[in-house]
Curated annotation (Swiss-Prot):
This is Methionyl-tRNA formyltransferase. It comes from Desulfotalea psychrophila (strain LSv54 / DSM 12343). NCBIfam families: fmt. (6S)-5,6,7,8-tetrahydrofolate binds at residues 121-124. One of its GO terms (cellular component) is cytosol. The gene is fmt. CDD domains: FMT_core_Met-tRNA-FMT_N, Met_tRNA_FMT_C. Its EC number is 2.1.2.9.
């Protein structure tokens, strides 16, 4: 049960923070710099990473250990032992940002002010693990973050606060990630202040308007050249930097970056390279053309098309394929 206002506006809240990736890091840093007390941090277990599969700590854990905070990394969240461990910290509030697990009701009800979540979309749009990427892929003309009172569903809780920004014309998932991380921190601090003062009122989501943003896989980046140039531009930007959009050149994977729609008319088949020059690859699509300025050949680093052409030949008869 969420209290509309704590006993005193001046009280320093005891906060448990739950999060894992870089997107959550700025929120934790802001809480550590603020008037409230982060009493513990919960994050995902360390995972093997890189070619050497070295066990690597989540970004949030690194920050927590630098601050001397206790860190919990449960493999399961639906256990009495984990609930008791959280309860021992007597939290007033639990803050969750990209933790990566759905929390059970006993945890949601543990703190007097409940659990609040910072989500990287304008809910109810893009519920799920990859809201930022999907917003770019879909070509949204406004994006933002939402703080919500968590319930047992996947991003279905009541909305506390929304903040909106307009993406730039050349926005990628990577650049938008950075902007929304900063915006999310601002929204979180404003939400906590509003909960303290009792000035924020929760509003139910319109579930009929909900859309999903499932986790992306590498294969989601495969380019279908029969789609329009506008759709492909959004796809390539939404897949940058990961998992990246790709096609095949002479049987080898070619990742594409920095696209721009061109309205040059052509009767060439989709995927045909119309021009390869210093400004990029001009490629025919299902509607209009696409100018791609940077690429990453298989086994090599990302580079400009101009740099690629210094050591490779690609002409007007080249066709980029899906296999």
């Amino acid at each position: 049960m969420v209290s509309s206002q704590i006993e005193s506006e001046e009280k320093s809240l005891r906060i448990i923070f739950m999060g894992t990736p870089d997107f959550a890091s700025s929120n934790l840093r802001a809480l550590l710099a603020g008037p409230d007390q982060v009493v513990a941090v919960v994050t995902q277990p360390d995972r093997p990473k890189g070619r050497g599969k070295k066990l690597t700590s989540p970004p949030v854990k690194v920050i927590a250990e630098e601050a001397g905070l206790p860190v919990l990394q449960p493999t399961k969240v639906r256990t009495d032992e984990f609930l008791e461990a959280l309860a021992a910290y007597a939290p007033d509030l639990i803050v969750v940002t990209a933790y990566g697990r759905i929390l059970p009701k006993p945890i949601l009800d543990l703190a007097p002010l409940g659990c609040i979540n910072v989500h990287g979309s304008l809910l109810p749009k893009y519920r799920g693990a990859a809201p930022i990427q999907w917003a770019v892929i879909q070509g949204d003309d406004e994006v933002g973050v939402t703080t919500m009172q968590m319930d047992e569903g996947m991003d279905t809780g009541d909305i506390l606060l929304r903040k909106i920004i307009i993406p730039s014309p050349d926005e990628t998932a990577g650049t938008l990630f950075d902007k929304l991380a900063e915006l999310g921190t601002s929204a979180l601090l404003e939400t906590i202040e509003g909960l303290k003062k009792g000035t924020i009122r929760a509003e139910a989501q319109d579930h009929a308007q909900a859309t999903e943003a499932p986790m992306l896989s590498k294969n989601d980046g495969l380019i279908d050249w029969s789609r329009t140039a506008t759709e492909l531009e959004s796809l390539i930007r939404g897949m940058d930097p990961w998992p990246s959009a790709f096609c095949f050149l002479e049987g080898k994977r070619l990742r594409l970056f920095m696209p721009e729609v061109s309205y040059q008319k052509t009767d060439a088949q989709p995927g045909a390279v119309l021009r390869a020059g210093r400004d990029g690859l001009l490629i025919a699509t299902g509607k209009n053309c696409l100018l791609v300025k940077e690429i990453q050949p298989e086994g090599k680093k990302r580079m400009t098309v101009e740099a690629f052409l210094c050591g490779a030949k690609i002409g007007a008869e080249t066709v980029l394929k899906t296999t």
